[in-house]
């Protein structure tokens, strides 16, 4: 009986097992059939990887109108966007997996040992003996010649340490590299354990709920798996749920599932293959189950355009979140590569350490290698920062809905980007300044050493091309005025600018810097006899290099003299007189009222035609005078169209910047005032004693007096364009003429003294010529200019300087 019972039990058990096996096979076949697949379960460090459950290509937008002609095209465009985002997610996830977990040091440890031994033995065989003899001789020199026993002993011990430590490292380089790498990985794991303790408070669903499943000893791998799940959820999973279910919570979506025994709603939608039959079955499932049973409006035909707009979120999120995550993995891998490169140079460093002056080279190289491993361990701090930051943002701003999801992504991306730019500050803060950089400021060094020099060189090349264009422009300016009035020698006639255009402007010369030069003084000899003469001048041209050289010299002289001026010294001492400033400001205002400044900047010594004209004019008798007012008016109109007539002297050939005549006001005020008073008296006496009828001849013979010709310059705004009619009359008592032998006196700020102006429109001058009984005398109408009293700027400066000195003395006495 007992035997029969045992047989029955065995038969029943066999039948039950057979039935269960068949049922399991049927279930598996029905679940993983021709059109669907089952989700894969793959773990890393004890954490399941969500990105491995289904292929990334199945994360698409699903809609019942996918076969429609127009709306189907929009569904296809939405899926193209999801495909682009999926490729980015695939790259970042693979990079995090490989670059974090790949250990090139462990792979090349044995090879490193063999290479180090071979290189060290080769160098030692060829150079070791000579370097050993040199070191021994140096120790003997220190001991015997210099008598430094302490230094000789130190060098000997250091040499022995180099030989011993170098030999030990070369024989076991691979083992030491593995040990250091393992220590850095262990340090990273321990640092991340602290983060897992904070994240361990999560008990419900979420990406951080799996942190408690991290296996011991695999903290780094498990933490990286959690971060991979986090990135996948933000970049691809959440946009997929929003587009297809209009919800971001997987728990809420699966609660409505009526088929509790099979796959949930999300897995069911992802389980369909992308084959023709799979797409047909998925479309039937969408119409019958999602739309009819679950009332899912997100997959209806009217939501096609909304799905297209929401799909772009996946692309943005995958890029802005993926860059910081991938950068951390890249730096972790880069540090290991740097360590391998340093190890390759260790044998050379220890051979050079045989030289006494380079005894520390081997130890320094090993120190750099140790710092790389320390930096690799400190990289765990950055990973912990990202890990904890993602957790905090996920808890404070849970992505429960489309708006909250967008806010979560924006805040997390901003924090990660700020942390990425401040990575060196984080490491420096944690290590108390011992480690100051994660990547040794690689990006900034690349910008300064590669990008910036290339940009500067490109700017120089662009500047050369720009200068070439400027030279062509100047060439066209110089020769643009040559039209119909050229003679056999190629000389132009009257300039096309008319009487109102100065010579420099009419010839096309650059007059940018002409305002800082001394005014061109024209002679009175050119006023006589113009009815039968017409002056033709050749255009005086200089090369571009000579013009630039003259400008540079003028600016250099002006700068040097300005620094040496008395006013500059007062300003350096901190003395600023309000009265002096007011006086200088008044001088600046009066500057525009003074003598017109010649536009043409060419060298006056080359204008020989004017010399010849003046000499011929002096030799001719004074018997050609004008006879009527009409001829005089005609001559004045023709004169305005001619080039200015100049008289050469020493000062004209040595024209420099106005600032070259700056001198010390305090030491020469009294002498200057006396000289000016004497000149005024002399001018008055001469002008009162000369007859009116002989004034023209006297002015021609007096080579020390010059009168500015009425050359209107409307472009600079000094005078209005009108012809001046001058009559012979004694000069007023308050008028002062400038001798050609005297340089124009200028204040230290470049302001010409009012008393030394050749012609100023605002001066108090009234010139007239009275009619003579002779038949050849021509009567000219009197022209008066608005006059007002002027005070010498030199006098104002002298008074201001004296007041400043008195004030300083009072301040010193009060102290």
From Swiss-Prot:
Keyword Cell membrane in record: yes
Region called Disordered, residue ranges: 483-815
GO cellular component annotations of the record: plasma membrane
Biased composition (Polar residues): 513-543, 619-630, 665-678, 720-732, 773-793
Residue spans crossing the bilayer: 127-147, 157-177, 311-331, 333-353, 372-392, 401-421
Keyword Nucleotide-binding on entry: no
Top-level taxonomic group: Bacteria
Xref: CDD domains: TM_PBP2
Cell location: Cell membrane
Position of the signal peptide: 1-25
Membrane topology: Multi-pass membrane protein
Main localization of the protein described in the UniProt heading: membrane
Basic and acidic residues bias: start-end ranges: 544-563, 599-614, 648-658, 696-705, 734-757, 796-815
Record keywords, A-Z: Cell membrane, Membrane, Signal, Transmembrane, Transmembrane helix
Gene Ontology biological-process annotations: transmembrane transport
NCBIfam families linked: CD3337_EF1877
Protein name: Uncharacterized membrane protein YddG
């Amino acid at each position: 009986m007992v035997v029969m019972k045992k047989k029955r039990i065995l038969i029943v058990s066999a039948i039950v097992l057979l039935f269960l096996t068949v049922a399991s096979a049927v279930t598996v076949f029905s679940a993983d059939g021709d059109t669907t697949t089952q989700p894969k379960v793959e773990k890393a460090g004890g954490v399941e990887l969500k990105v491995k459950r289904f292929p990334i290509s199945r994360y698409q937008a699903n809609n019942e109108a996918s076969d429609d002609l127009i709306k189907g095209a929009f569904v296809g465009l939405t899926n193209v966007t999801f495909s682009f985002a999926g490729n980015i997610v695939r790259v970042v996830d693979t990079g995090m997996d490989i670059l974090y977990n790949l250990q090139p040091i462990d792979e090349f440890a044995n090879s490193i040992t063999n290479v180090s031994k071979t290189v060290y033995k080769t160098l030692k065989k060829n150079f070791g003996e000579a370097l050993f003899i040199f070191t021994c001789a140096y120790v003997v020199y220190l001991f015997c010649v210099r008598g430094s026993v302490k230094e000789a002993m130190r060098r000997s011990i250091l040499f022995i340490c180099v030989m011993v430590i170098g030999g030990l490292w070369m024989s076991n380089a691979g083992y030491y590299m593995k040990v250091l790498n393992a220590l850095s990985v262990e340090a990273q794991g321990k640092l991340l354990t602290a983060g897992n303790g904070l994240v361990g408070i999560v008990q419900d669903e979420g990406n951080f709920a799996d942190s408690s499943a991290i296996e011991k000893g695999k903290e780094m791998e498990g933490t990286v798996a959690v971060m991979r799940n986090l990135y996948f959820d933000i970049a691809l999973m959440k946009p997929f749920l929003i587009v297809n279910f209009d919800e971001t919570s997987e728990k809420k979506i699966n609660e409505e599932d009526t088929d509790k025994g099979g796959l949930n709603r999300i897995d069911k939608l992802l389980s369909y293959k992308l084959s023709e039959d799979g797409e047909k079955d998925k479309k039937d499932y969408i119409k019958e189950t999602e739309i009819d049973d679950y009332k899912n409006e997100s997959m209806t035909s009217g939501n096609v355009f909304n799905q297209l707009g929401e799909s772009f979120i996946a692309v943005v999120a995958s890029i802005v979140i993926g860059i910081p995550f991938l950068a951390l993995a890249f730096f972790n891998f880069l540090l290991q590569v740097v360590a391998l490169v340093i190890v390759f140079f260790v044998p050379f460093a220890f051979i050079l350490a045989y030289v006494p002056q380079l005894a520390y080279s081997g130890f320094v190289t090993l120190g750099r290698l140790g710092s790389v491993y320390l930096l690799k361990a400190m990289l765990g701090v950055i990973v912990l920062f990202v890990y904890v930051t993602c957790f905090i943002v996920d808890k404070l701003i849970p992505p429960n809905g489309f708006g909250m999801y967008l806010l979560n992504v924006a805040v997390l991306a901003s924090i990660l980007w700020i942390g990425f730019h401040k990575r060196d500050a984080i490491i420096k803060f944690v290590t108390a300044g011992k480690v100051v950089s994660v990547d040794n400021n690689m990006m900034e060094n690349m910008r300064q050493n590669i990008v910036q020099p290339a940009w500067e060189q490109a700017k120089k090349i662009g500047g050369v091309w720009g200068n070439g264009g400027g030279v062509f422009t100047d060439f066209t300016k110089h020769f643009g005025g040559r039209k119909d009035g050229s003679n056999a020698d190629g000389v132009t006639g009257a300039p096309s600018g008319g009487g109102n255009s100065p010579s420099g402007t009419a010839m096309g010369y650059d007059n940018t810097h002409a305002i800082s030069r001394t005014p061109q003084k024209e002679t009175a000899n050119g006023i006589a006899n113009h009815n039968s003469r017409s002056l033709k001048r050749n255009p005086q041209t200089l090369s571009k290099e000579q013009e630039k050289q003259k400008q540079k010299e003028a600016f250099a002289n002006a700068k040097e003299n300005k620094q040496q001026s008395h006013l500059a010294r007062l300003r350096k001492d901190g003395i600023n007189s309000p009265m002096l400033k007011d006086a200088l400001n008044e001088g600046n205002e009066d500057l525009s009222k003074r003598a017109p400044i010649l536009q043409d900047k060419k060298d006056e010594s080359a204008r020989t035609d004017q010399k010849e004209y003046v000499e011929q004019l002096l030799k001719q008798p004074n018997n050609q005078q004008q006879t009527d007012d009409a001829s005089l008016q005609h001559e004045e109109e023709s004169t305005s169209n001619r080039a200015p007539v100049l008289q050469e002297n020493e000062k004209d050939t040595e024209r420099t910047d106005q600032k070259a005549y700056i001198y010390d006001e305090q030491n020469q005020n009294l002498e200057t005032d006396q000289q000016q008073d004497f000149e005024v008296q002399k001018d008055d006496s001469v002008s009162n004693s000369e007859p009116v009828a002989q004034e023209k001849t006297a002015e021609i013979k007096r080579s020390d007096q010059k009168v500015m010709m009425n050359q209107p310059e409307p472009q600079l705004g000094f005078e209005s364009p009108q012809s001046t009619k001058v009559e012979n009359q004694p000069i007023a008592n308050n008028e002062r003429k400038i001798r050609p032998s005297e340089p124009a006196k200028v204040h230290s700020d470049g302001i010409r003294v009012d008393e030394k102006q050749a012609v100023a429109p605002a001066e108090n001058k009234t010139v007239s010529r009275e009619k003579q009984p002779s038949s050849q005398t021509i009567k000219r109408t009197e022209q008066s200019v608005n006059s007002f009293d002027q005070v010498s700027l030199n006098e104002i400066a002298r008074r201001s300087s004296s007041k400043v000195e008195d004030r300083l003395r009072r301040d010193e006495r009060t102290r």
